[in-house]
C-alpha cells in the first residue's frame, strides 16, 4: 500500500527573513512523490503586482506588456518574490487588465483576482462577488474557480476544464492562488497534482476562494530575491528558485519575459 502522506512536512526551503510562511505537503497518498509548496502572503506586509508578458496574454487591444519587474531603485529595494501568472490567451481568453489598461476583457463566471484603487485585493468570481467597477485598477482571470465561498468546485472531476499537459495528462505540475477569509493570499505549487488535489491543498491552507494559475513544469515558477550591493552603488537583486524542478531560471522576471506574472514587494 502507498505510504501515508506527511501532512504537513514543514521545511526551511524559503529564507525565514522574507516573512512569508512556507511549508511543504505530500497531499496524495497514491503518489508519495507528489509534493506541494504552500506560501502565505499577508497584504498588510506586502504588495502584490501584476505584469503582462511581452507575448501573453495575446492582447485583443494591441497592448504589449513589459514582461519584467520594473528596474527602479524602490522596486529593487522592496522586491521579495515573483511567481507565474495564468494561461496563455489561446487557452480561454481570460481577462487581464494592468493599471487600467485592458489587454483582454473580463469574462463572467470566471475566477478573478482584482486590485482596487484603495489598495485592497479580492479573489472571487467575476459577475458574482466581483462586479465590474471603476474602482478596479487591475485584474487577472483564469478558469472556473477551484474554490468558491469555502466550497471546492463539484466540477473538478471534469479534468479538461482545469487543463491537461501536452500529452493529455491531468496529474501534472500545477499552481494556484487562494485568499483566506481574513484577506491573506496563499500560493500553492507542486508536481504531480490533479486540479482536485491542488484545490484540497489550498482549502487546507485556509483558502475561502481560489483560482488555478499556470500549469506544467515549463510554466510554474516561484522565485525569491535578495538584495546585494552592485559595483555602481545601485542595489542589485539576485533570484533563487524555490524548487530546482521548476524549469525557470534564477533570474526569471528580471529580464523581459513572454508570459504574465506576479511580483511581491515589501511595504516600505
Positions of predicted regions on the chain:
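Extracytoplasmic
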Residues: 33-36, 76-78, 108-110, 141, ...
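Broad, structure-driven detector of short, well-ordered beta-strand segments within folded domains
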Residues: 39, 46-47, 112-115, 177
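Hydrophobic residues embedded in beta-strands of well-ordered beta-sheets
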Residues: 46, 119-122, 184-185
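Active-site-adjacent helix-turn-beta-strand microarchitecture at beta-sheet edges
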Residues: 83-153, 157
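Catalytic metal-binding/acid-base residues of hydrolase active sites
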Residues: 88, 216-218
Amino acid at each position: 500500500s502507498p505510504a501515508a502522506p506527511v501532512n504537513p512536512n514543514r521545511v526551511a526551503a524559503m529564507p525565514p527573513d522574507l516573512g512569508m510562511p512556507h511549508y511543504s505537503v505530500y497531499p496524495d497518498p497514491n503518489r508519495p512523490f507528489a509534493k506541494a509548496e504552500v506560501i502565505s502572503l499577508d497584504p498588510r506586509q506586502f504588495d502584490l503586482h501584476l505584469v503582462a508578458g511581452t507575448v501573453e496574454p495575446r492582447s485583443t487591444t494591441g497592448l504589449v506588456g513589459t514582461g519584467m519587474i520594473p528596474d527602479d531603485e524602490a522596486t529593487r529595494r522592496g522586491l521579495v518574490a515573483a511567481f507565474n501568472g495564468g494561461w496563455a490567451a489561446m487557452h480561454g481568453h481570460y481577462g487581464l487588465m494592468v493599471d487600467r489598461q485592458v489587454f483582454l476583457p473580463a469574462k463572467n463566471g470566471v475566477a478573478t483576482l482584482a486590485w482596487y484603487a484603495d489598495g485592497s485585493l479580492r479573489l472571487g468570481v467575476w459577475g458574482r462577488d466581483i462586479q465590474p467597477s471603476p474602482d478596479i485598477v487591475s485584474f487577472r482571470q483564469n478558469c472556473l474557480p477551484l474554490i468558491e465561498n469555502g466550497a471546492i468546485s463539484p466540477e473538478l472531476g471534469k479534468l479538461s476544464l482545469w487543463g491537461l499537459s501536452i500529452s493529455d495528462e491531468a496529474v501534472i505540475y500545477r499552481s494556484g492562488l487562494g485568499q483566506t477569509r481574513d484577506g491573506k493570499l496563499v500560493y500553492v505549487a507542486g508536481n504531480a497534482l490533479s486540479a482536485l488535489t491542488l484545490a484540497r491543498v489550498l482549502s487546507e491552507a485556509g483558502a475561502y476562494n481560489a483560482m488555478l494559475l499556470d500549469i506544467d513544469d515549463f510554466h510554474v515558477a516561484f522565485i525569491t530575491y535578495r538584495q546585494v550591493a552592485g559595483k555602481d552603488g545601485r542595489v542589485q537583486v539576485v533570484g533563487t528558485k524555490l524548487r530546482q524542478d521548476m524549469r525557470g531560471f534564477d533570474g526569471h522576471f528580471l529580464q523581459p519575459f513572454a508570459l504574465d506574472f506576479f511580483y511581491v514587494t515589501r511595504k516600505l
